[in-house]
Amino acid sequence: MATEQIYKQFTSRTLLNFFEVAALTDGETNESVAAVCKIAAKDPAIVGVSVRPAFVRFIRQELVKSAPEVAGIKVCAAVNFPEGTGTPDTVSLEAVGALKDGADEIECLIDWRRMNENVADGESRIRLLVSEVKKVVGPKTLKVVLSGGELQGGDIISRAAVAALEGGADFLQTSSGLGATHATMFTVHLISIALREYMVRENERIRVEGINREGAAVRCIGIKIEVGDVHMAETADFLMQMIFENGPRSIVRDKFRVGGGFNLLKELRDCYESWDSVGVSPDTSP
């Protein structure tokens, strides 16, 4: 019979499989980023690390020489951070530079302040920003950070999510990890509804426009829940909500990520590595 400890280890292993650790504070250095990357790349490796663009070249060209295991994790460059007030041109250039340096994915913050001030104008700015950045990102993954904790009300969160989807977002991310409020169940609920309704509209558009060529379908879109430095139990609650809201088929890396801080990553690792069953080794397969 499974014990409480086994359930905890199973939960930690599951969360590690979808985890992205953030190293985005103003005080980050090559040394601090290296420490985060090395723990991120331990077996079983997490999805990746989110960093400012200035650190992408260091990770991809220098750190991998002394820690080759780091080559196995994704590097996501966070652009338009931390204020979210850049123009589409400047943010696109920032993304281009990060991609040239070796970034695998881009994480783009919206102008949440403008969204609060004038919703209609904020929506237009989100669509334009996301569409322009997506042009340079191309087939690589573009996550759009909605800063749900900063947006003033459920309607604004929903409209920001829809605008990001219409601009071409590959992932909707609840928050940046830098604000006072990270993911909430309410924000995840609203984003899930926005995504489901968008997928229905897009499928109907494809049907009505007669786009019936083989393989025609709405692009794959995911949700990233940024939890900050909460504990494993709270993070597991978001995993269960994701399954409840979007179904078990949504729990794949192309559709689901969990973002968090270094302390949460260490807690997940410590729990997983506490396995002590005699004669039994934990499964380390991806």
Swiss-Prot record:
GO terms for molecular function: enzyme activator activity; lyase activity. Its main location: cytoplasm. It comes from Toxoplasma gondii. Homodimer. Interacts with ADF; the interaction enhances ADF activity in disassembly of filamentous actin and inhibition of actin polymerization. The keyword Phosphoprotein does not apply. It comes from the Eukaryota. Involved in regulation of actin dynamics. Keywords: Cytoplasm. It is found in: Cytoplasm. GO terms for biological process: carbohydrate catabolic process; deoxyribonucleotide catabolic process; deoxyribose phosphate catabolic process. This is Divergent deoxyribose-phosphate aldolase-like protein. SMART domains: DeoC.
